[in-house]
Amino acid sequence: MAIRDIIDLLESQGEWVNRSCTRDRILFGDDQTEISKVITCWVATNKVIQYAIEHDIHFIISHENPFYLASTTLPTLIYKAQKEKEALLKENNITIYRCHDLWDVYPEYGIRDSWANKLDLDFEESHDHSYYRYTHDINMTVEECAQHIINKIKPYHQQGIEIIGDKTQIIHRLGIGTGACTDVFEMYEEGADACLVSDDGVSNWIGVQWAVDHDIPLIVINHMTCEAPGMEHMVEYLSKQFPEVTFTFVSNDYGIYLSLIHISEPTRRSY
């Protein structure tokens, strides 16, 4: 099967995607390559590419841009890293396709719904092509909710979570977003009294400051962690469409840790 066959299926869907200006494109390689194995991942790091090389896989579907930054004014270190990654891909005949705009809100299998399902909370039905989901009354403290989430995200190599605000406050309507689309203002206007946000989806000097002033607790998750379930779920979807192809989700397993260091009062010397 040619890579183009898989891309054509993906690009034939998604009325919410602006195909005249989209992130969903081949970023490197040839769409006519014949393949029998495919990797899905959150981002095609060097480690993911090495996995592809070791397993003779020549097509990677990456949710995020594996080339760091798209610009004509690049830091030299990024420019150099891009060229090194491109050389590695070319040497091993690997094509990378970015599937972002389609998969963010693809029903059931996509990023938004897979994240909500992974959290295993009582969510309302999703609406249209919104990036946001909201729970029914979960009646949990912020700390209880955070611990529940920690238990659900362990497969994605995040070992802790950040809470901003009163951890004893009761959550009734939790709002969650999709990846970096975690706008606390939009979730608040839809009735959320606490928000699960990504580290790339909130700013400390704007969203966090406002949430603190308005008693809206925030639970902060890593961007990768909240999107990985959707890229894992893509394997199930594509396997049904192309049963003759082997699809494998490769996790970005670099590890995300929150270390709690208790600092004691300094010892005062007597002179």
At which residue positions do the language-model features occur?
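A short, hydrophobic C-terminal helix/tail in secreted or cell-surface proteins
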Residues: 263-271
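Active-site catalytic microenvironments in core metabolic enzymes, especially phosphate/sugar-handling
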Residues: 1-260, 264
